[in-house]
Swiss-Prot record:
Keyword Nucleotide-binding in record: no
Pfam families on file: LolB (PF03550)
Annotated organism of origin: Ralstonia pickettii (strain 12J)
Protein's name according to its UniProt entry: Outer-membrane lipoprotein LolB
Residues linked to a lipid group, S-diacylglycerol cysteine type: 18
InterPro entries listed in its UniProt record: LolA/LolB/LppX (IPR029046), OM_lipoprot_LolB (IPR004565)
Recorded GO CC terms: cell outer membrane
Gene3D superfamilies: Lipoprotein localisation LolA/LolB/LppX (2.50.20.10)
Signal peptide interval: 1-17
Length: 207
C-alpha cells in the first residue's frame, strides 16, 4: 500500500493530474486541529510555500514537488501537502495525543510520532518536530546541535538529529534578531544517512 501511494504521489506532484484518485475528492482532516480559526489569528503560526524532495526508494532515486501549508499553535502542528495543481495529497497532524496521517480514499493512520507515518506512506519524511524550531532559525531544544552563523549572526547551517539545515535565502527583514519574526525565504534540509537512504528537501516560504 505504501509503495503504491508513493508512486501515485510522485506522479501527481509531477503534474500527471488527479485521475489517480477517484473523483479528486477534496481531502479534509477528520480531526481538524484548527477548525474555526482564522488566518489572522495571532495565536497561530502559519507558513506557506513550495517544497521539493529527493529520496531513495527501492534503490532508485525518486523526487516530488508541490506546495505546503503549515499551521502551528502550542503543541499542535498541522501540515498539508498539495500537488502543483492544488489537490490536497496528505494531511499530517501532530499533537500531545500523537500523530495522524490522512491520505485520499484511505482511513487515517495514527502513531505516536509523525516521521514513521510519513516515511511508510510517502517514501520520505519531513522532520516535523525539528522544523518547529528550524523555521524560527534556531536549534530544537533537548538535543545537541552545531550552528554556524553569518556576519549578521543569522544561522547559515544547523546540524542536529542527523539533519543539516542550510539557510539559503532571507527576506529583506532577515536581519531581525527576533527568532519568531526572522525572515527566512528558503531553507534546504539534508539527511545523508538513514534507514531508507539519503533525503534532501527544499522549502521556499512565500509567507
Amino acid at each position: 500500500m505504501a509503495m503504491r501511494f508513493a508512486h501515485a504521489l510522485g506522479a501527481l506532484m509531477l503534474g500527471a493530474g488527479c485521475a489517480l484518485f477517484s473523483g479528486c475528492a477534496s481531502l479534509r482532516p477528520a480531526n481538524d486541529l484548527f477548525a474555526g480559526t482564522q488566518d489572522a489569528d495571532t495565536n497561530i503560526t502559519r507558513y506557506q510555500g513550495r517544497f521539493s524532495a529527493r529520496y531513495t526508494q527501492n534503490n532508485a532515486e525518486q523526487s516530488a514537488v508541490g506546495s505546503f501549508l503549515w499551521r502551528e499553535r502550542g503543541p499542535d502542528v498541522q501540515l498539508e501537502l498539495m500537488s502543483p495543481l492544488g489537490q490536497t495529497l496528505a494531511i499530517v497532524s501532530q499533537s500531545n495525543q500523537g500523530a495522524t496521517l490522512e491520505l485520499p480514499n484511505q482511513p487515517p493512520r495514527r502513531a505516536p510520532e509523525v516521521d514513521t507515518l510519513m516515511q511508510d506512506a510517502l517514501g520520505f519524511s519531513l522532520p516535523v518536530s525539528g522544523l518547529r524550531d528550524w523555521l524560527r532559525a534556531r536549534p530544537a531544544p533537548g538535543t545537541p546541535a552545531r550552528v554556524a552563523r553569518d556576519a549578521q549572526s543569522r544561522p547559515e547551517t544547523i546540524e542536529q538529529n542527523g539533519w543539516t539545515v542550510h539557510y539559503v535565502a532571507w527576506t529583506d527583514d532577515g536581519n531581525n534578531t527576533d527568532g519568531a519574526k526572522v525572515g527566512i525565504r528558503r531553507l534546504d534540509l539534508d539527511r545523508p544517512q538513514g534507514t531508507n537512504g539519503p533525503l534532501s528537501v527544499r522549502l521556499v516560504l512565500d509567507q
